[in-house]
């Protein structure tokens, strides 16, 4: 998993509440267990028309936001089913941070496991970030994880809270496998000792 230290990028405003995981990645994309290639399916029912052409009115199809790294979203983002394909699709599209007032619990946890930083802010701060994001090509935010701070294009800041363990994992690029590998020396030592003491096993 890639480390998350400081992220600077365009923020796309998605002013929709209760965005569920089925909207993030529809069911027809769940047949694969590969994490790559799902970016095309991200918000596909909003991004594409019935004939397969792009919907020019959807935010991620607008030229200013095609390369967005940050998503500023309405309340209760990621509610619904537990599909881990939702954060996979966001990550494959290029989004590494989602900012909202609240998240679906399972989606929130899955984000951390996949290197995405979900940030909870107050409604007042979200409204301010929506204003920043609506600047289009000038909608650049900086996410400073070490200092738990969002910096806007005018230099304004928004502080955020994050669990210390999850912060450690993101800063060091540690997923579940990475955390296990941190203890490799202790695991090897235990296995060597077990082989000596229970050679019969």
From Swiss-Prot:
Signal sequence region: none
EC number of the protein: 4.2.1.33
Listed GO CC annotations: 3-isopropylmalate dehydratase complex
Key word ATP-binding present: no
GO BP: any one term: L-leucine biosynthetic process
Molecular function as annotated in GO: 3-isopropylmalate dehydratase activity
Record's catalysed reaction(s): (2R,3S)-3-isopropylmalate = (2S)-2-isopropylmalate
Pathway connected to this protein: Amino-acid biosynthesis; L-leucine biosynthesis; L-leucine from 3-methyl-2-oxobutanoate: step 2/4
Record keywords: Amino-acid biosynthesis, Branched-chain amino acid biosynthesis, Leucine biosynthesis, Lyase
InterPro entries according to UniProt: 3-IsopropMal_deHydase_ssu (IPR004431), Aconitase/3IPM_dehydase_swvl (IPR015928), AconitaseA/IPMdHydase_ssu_swvl (IPR000573), IPMI_Swivel (IPR033940), LeuD (IPR050075)
CDD domains: IPMI_Swivel
Organism domain of life: Bacteria
Job description of the protein: Catalyzes the isomerization between 2-isopropylmalate and 3-isopropylmalate, via the formation of 2-isopropylmaleate.
Family (UniProt): Belongs to the LeuD family. LeuD type 1 subfamily.
NCBIfam families for the chain: leuD, PRK01641.1
Subunit-structure text: Heterodimer of LeuC and LeuD.
UniProt name for this protein: 3-isopropylmalate dehydratase small subunit
Native species: Nitrobacter winogradskyi (strain ATCC 25391 / DSM 10237 / CIP 104748 / NCIMB 11846 / Nb-255)
Gene name per UniProt: leuD
